[in-house]
Swiss-Prot record:
Subunit structure: Part of the 30S ribosomal subunit. Contacts proteins S5 and S12.
TM spans (from-to): none
Protein family (similarity comment): Belongs to the universal ribosomal protein uS8 family.
Keywords, ordered alphabetically: Ribonucleoprotein, Ribosomal protein, RNA-binding, rRNA-binding
Species: Bdellovibrio bacteriovorus (strain ATCC 15356 / DSM 50701 / NCIMB 9529 / HD100)
BP terms from Gene Ontology: translation
Alphabetical list of Gene3D superfamilies matching this protein: 3.30.1370.30, 3.30.1490.10
UniProt-listed InterPro entries: Ribosomal_uS8 (IPR000630), Ribosomal_uS8_sf (IPR035987)
Function: One of the primary rRNA binding proteins, it binds directly to 16S rRNA central domain where it helps coordinate assembly of the platform of the 30S subunit.
A Gene Ontology molecular function term of the record: structural constituent of ribosome
Cellular component terms per the entry's GO annotation: ribonucleoprotein complex; ribosome
Protein name: Small ribosomal subunit protein uS8
Gene: rpsH
Length: 129
């Protein structure tokens, strides 16, 4: 399993189990995706703690008033065996704007909305709502 899929799966499973936080190995890609999720309001926050190896990233999950997880569904689109690339005018709108897509561009990892505004295409990593 690739690291992005593992990251998304850990968040999905922790949300289903109603955990307050989830710990995982840190990486720059995971930190970039987590920052996008914080900016868009899907998770509360995250922090990276250094250890003797690569570091530990702790993600604090977000729930609504009824106790439901803020992320209803996460889909990994581009995988190591099947890469999916999109142009800036073909970035999908997820759930009529209620969700978001995560794109890896030449300027870094960003939301689909940011990539469209900057007219950047790239690899469509995931969609969520």
């Amino acid at each position: 399993m690739d690291t992005i899929s593992q990251f998304l799966t850990m968040i999905r499973n922790a949300g289903a189990a109603k955990h307050e936080k989830v710990d995982m190995p840190a990486s720059k890609v995971r930190a970039g995706i987590a920052q996008i999720l914080v900016n868009e309001g899907f998770i509360r926050s995250f922090k990276v703690a250094k250890d003797s190896k690569q570091g530990i990233m702790r993600v604090y999950l977000k729930y609504d008033e009824a106790g439901g997880h803020a992320i209803n569904n996460i889909d990994r689109v581009s995988r190591p065996g099947r890469r999916v690339y999109v142009k800036s005018d073909k970035i999908p709108t997820v759930r009529s704007g209620m969700g978001m897509s995560i794109i890896s561009t030449s300027k870094g990892i960003m939301s689909g909305k940011q990539a469209t505004e900057q007219k950047l295409g790239g690899e469509l990593l995931a969609t969520l709502w």
